[in-house]
Amino acid sequence: MNERLIVKSFGPVNDLDIIFKKVTLFIGDQGTGKSCVAKLFSMFKWTEKVLSQKKYKLSYFEQYNRFKTKLCAYHRIESFIYENSYIKFEGNLYDFLYENGNFSVTEKNRDIKGISKVMYVPAERSIVSVAENKSKLLKELPDSSETFSDEFVNAKKFFQSGYNLPFEGLRFEYDSLN
């Protein structure tokens, strides 16, 4: 995995250079950019996935300021972009660079051996389970909350009869009464 994210002057993040391992844990005070970095990572992993699946061309994301108006706007972080913002993500299959107001994508020409599913779980996650059938309330939340809500409903259906976890003989079961 060992993907790398470099961020300068983006929202609360002044200067960051992080290498993502199989498990990466963010610890810090509130408002220091943990969620911002998680949203960027999730966004780049999603973009890498759809590009590798040929659902979009590289040029789609590079044109018309879509980095800001589509990708960042999805997580409501478009206002975090400043004139001097610099963001570089070195993924497994693509490199992404935002610099001087321009966004570019470079393909690495590597074999695809499976792309993991990464999703940012929004802070509004607790509202999703309570407001599952209240579509008007959910529409006021960020788009990432709607995606999380859809995945939450699918997971409940999938795990309805339980799931054996891959360690210590543990089993997960969802009980809607708890």
Per-region residue spans from a language model:
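Phosphate-coordinating catalytic segments in nucleotide- and nucleic-acid-processing enzymes
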Residues: 47-178
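Pre-Walker A-like glycine/lysine-rich segment at the N-terminus of P-loop NTPase domains
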Residues: 1-42
